[in-house]
């Protein structure tokens, strides 16, 4: 038995080539339905709005046993507002309680870090905020120096402060 806070499953960047994404979704559904993770909160990192996979991810993975989603590449509060409403429609159509599925926005660009406070406030479904350092450094066209990571101190601290002031988990 694990002492993990949550189980995080992934259908985003770690699933390549893209033709494997359906296999990943099917595997997640099979493992959830088998009860493998029944004692845990389960979140799935899904593909972003512009990927072409978001709708498939959400419609197939809004099932009992999934508690929420990591919403990749969140840039603005509109991204979260859109995703919140998408979840609401699915919950309504499937007879789930509205608000069942939680959101963890992942901030991976300079714009998203600047917009962190409005993103945090965009939905009552938000339970935490994540910071994606690899994509953040790419967005800045920076040098990856994760050993010292001095260039990441400010955005990490900012995201943590925004999370705490909005009563979210950093």
Predicted region positions:
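Expand to "…catalyze enediolate/carbanion chemistry for C-C bond making/breaking, isomerization
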Residues: 1-170
């Amino acid at each position: 038995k694990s002492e993990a806070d949550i189980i995080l499953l992934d259908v985003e960047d770690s699933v390549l080539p893209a033709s494997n994404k359906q296999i990943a979704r099917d595997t997640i559904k099979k493992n959830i339905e088998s009860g493998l993770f029944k004692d845990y909160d389960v979140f799935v990192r899904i593909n972003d709005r512009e990927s072409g996979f978001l709708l498939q991810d959400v419609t197939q993975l809004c099932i009992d046993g999934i508690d929420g989603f990591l919403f990749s590449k969140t840039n603005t509060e509109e991204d979260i507002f859109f995703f919140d409403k998408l979840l609401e429609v699915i919950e309504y159509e499937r007879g789930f309680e509205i608000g069942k599925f939680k959101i963890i926005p992942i901030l991976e660009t300079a714009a998203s870090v600047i917009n962190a406070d409005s993103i945090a406030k965009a939905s009552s479904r938000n339970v935490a905020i994540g910071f994606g350092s690899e994509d953040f450094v790419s967005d800045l066209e920076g040098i990856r120096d994760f050993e010292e990571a001095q260039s990441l101190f400010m955005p990490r601290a900012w995201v943590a402060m925004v999370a705490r002031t909005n009563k979210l988990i950093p």
